[in-house]
A protein has these predicted regions:
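Class I SAM-dependent methyltransferase SAM/SAH-binding core
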Residues: 1-40
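Active-site-proximal loop/turn and secondary-structure-junction residues that shape catalytic pockets
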Residues: 17, 56-57, 86
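Short conserved AdoMet
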Residues: 26, 61, 75
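A short acidic, Gly/Pro-enriched loop at the edge of an enzyme's catalytic core
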Residues: 39-51
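A short SAM/SAH-binding and catalytic strip from SAM-dependent methyltransferases
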Residues: 49-62
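A short glycine-rich, Lys/Arg-flanked "PGG" loop and its adjoining helix->strand segment in the class I
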Residues: 64-79
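Acidic carboxylate diad motif detector
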Residues: 82-84
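Substrate-binding/catalytic lobe of Class I Rossmann-like enzymes that use SAM or dcSAM, i.e.
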Residues: 93-189
Length: 190
């Protein structure tokens, strides 16, 4: 925020995440954080010059409403940037039985309603009443995939970060390893 001179408003449904964000953000940064439902944003139309969403869409059970809320709060000519978990187009390339089993495990483990393809979400954005009609999308898997193994090794590099959180965090972290490995496999398969 300071580097670019932005005023930033971050939202999450988690009061704990808001508390943590406030603790980690230097006072001089022009950032504020709010507990808010992304499917029911309490901002006026055209409030923001830019909207940035990172890995939130996979958690949304209504992708159209999610897109509508982001685009509604974006000023005309503003920028929307999204980074999210998507699937390949499952109509064009249906999943194998093994892929269906793994996809079910990923959705259940991380409590996601469903993944959709980049093209499907692009269509939702293009056809939205608040859209300028211009959407540029890309698959960045090859750039982001290496970070999956880093997330496992981070616990080994800094074990006190996990150990200090207590037994529940340790058990959860160990449970996450197979799911992270499955997600890595799934990213490579599309």
């Amino acid at each position: 925020a300071n580097y670019y001179g932005f005023n930033v408003t971050g939202i999450t449904i988690s009061p704990a995440q808001v508390k943590r964000a406030k603790e980690l953000t230097p006072y001089e940064c022009k950032c504020n954080f709010k507990v808010m439902d992304a499917l029911d944003l309490k901002f006026e139309e055209g409030t923001f010059d830019g909207v940035w969403s990172v890995e939130a869409g996979a958690h949304m059970n209504n992708k159209t409403k999610f897109a509508d809320q982001m685009l509604r709060t974006l000023r005309p000519g503003g920028y929307l940037a999204l980074a999210d978990w998507n699937s390949r187009d499952l109509q064009k390339q249906p999943p194998s039985m093994l892929e269906k089993i793994i996809l079910k495990q990923l959705l259940e483990q991380w409590v996601h309603p469903k993944f959709i393809s980049i093209n499907d979400f692009s269509s939702i954005l293009i056809n939205n009443k608040n859209s300028s009609g211009q959407v540029i999308s890309s698959n960045w898997n090859s750039f982001t995939n290496p970070s999956w193994f880093d997330s496992i090794f981070e616990g080994m590099r800094r074990p006190n970060a996990i150990l200090s959180l207590g037994p529940g965090a340790i058990i959860k972290s160990i449970r996450e390893i197979p799911t992270i490995l499955l997600m890595d496999w799934a990213f490579k398969k599309g």
